[in-house]
Swiss-Prot record:
<dbReference type="GO" id="GO:0062054">
    <property type="term" value="F:fluoride channel activity"/>
</dbReference>
<keyword id="KW-0915">Sodium</keyword>
<feature type="transmembrane region" description="Helical">
    <location>
        <begin position="32"/>
        <end position="52"/>
    </location>
</feature>
<feature type="transmembrane region" description="Helical">
    <location>
        <begin position="3"/>
        <end position="23"/>
    </location>
</feature>
<protein>
    <recommendedName>
        <fullName>Fluoride-specific ion channel FluC 2</fullName>
    </recommendedName>
</protein>
<keyword id="KW-1133">Transmembrane helix</keyword>
<keyword id="KW-0479">Metal-binding</keyword>
<feature type="transmembrane region" description="Helical">
    <location>
        <begin position="90"/>
        <end position="110"/>
    </location>
</feature>
<dbReference type="GO" id="GO:0046872">
    <property type="term" value="F:metal ion binding"/>
</dbReference>
<keyword id="KW-1003">Cell membrane</keyword>
<dbReference type="GO" id="GO:0005886">
    <property type="term" value="C:plasma membrane"/>
</dbReference>
<keyword id="KW-0813">Transport</keyword>
<dbReference type="InterPro" id="IPR003691">
    <property type="entry name" value="FluC"/>
</dbReference>
<dbReference type="GO" id="GO:0140114">
    <property type="term" value="P:cellular detoxification of fluoride"/>
</dbReference>
<keyword id="KW-0472">Membrane</keyword>
<feature type="transmembrane region" description="Helical">
    <location>
        <begin position="59"/>
        <end position="79"/>
    </location>
</feature>
<keyword id="KW-0812">Transmembrane</keyword>
């Protein structure tokens, strides 16, 4: 059953990535790949923490979402190819900017995803000092 969920969610994630490519693709900078990777970092951090603690969704479906959807939506291989293409075309500033935005931005998006999840999970709690 796990493979079915990963496959179904993977197909949806791949279609969403393709749609983002159509919407943001083109130009000299790989903005579509950067966008899907940053969104994916946020979604993985948020959804995996929030859904695991708050919902009744089974672990099999959670893994399908994380491995399938987010895995197919994000792309390290396209990031790597895009970076090499920027370097080979002499666009060093774009290449360095892209690498920094991807890594630093990814970490920031994970932090935001976890912060939002924590905020929503702790929303109804009242602490007595």
């Amino acid at each position: 059953m796990y493979f079915l969920y990963v496959g179904v969610f993977g197909a949806l994630g791949g279609m969403c990535r393709y749609a983002m490519n159509l919407w943001l693709g083109g130009g000299d900078f790989p903005s579509a790949t950067l966008a899907v990777n940053l969104i994916g970092c946020f979604l993985l951090a948020f959804l995996m923490q929030f859904l695991a603690e708050k919902s009744r969704i089974s672990l099999v479906i959670l893994n399908g979402i994380g491995t399938g959807f987010i895995g197919a939506f994000t792309t390290f291989s396209a990031f790597s190819v895009d970076t090499i293409q920027l370097v080979q075309s002499g666009a060093w500033l774009f290449a360095v900017s892209y690498v920094l935005a991807s890594f630093i931005g990814g970490l920031i998006m994970v932090k935001f995803g976890r912060m939002l999840s924590n905020k929503l999970l702790n929303r109804g709690e009242h602490r007595v000092s």
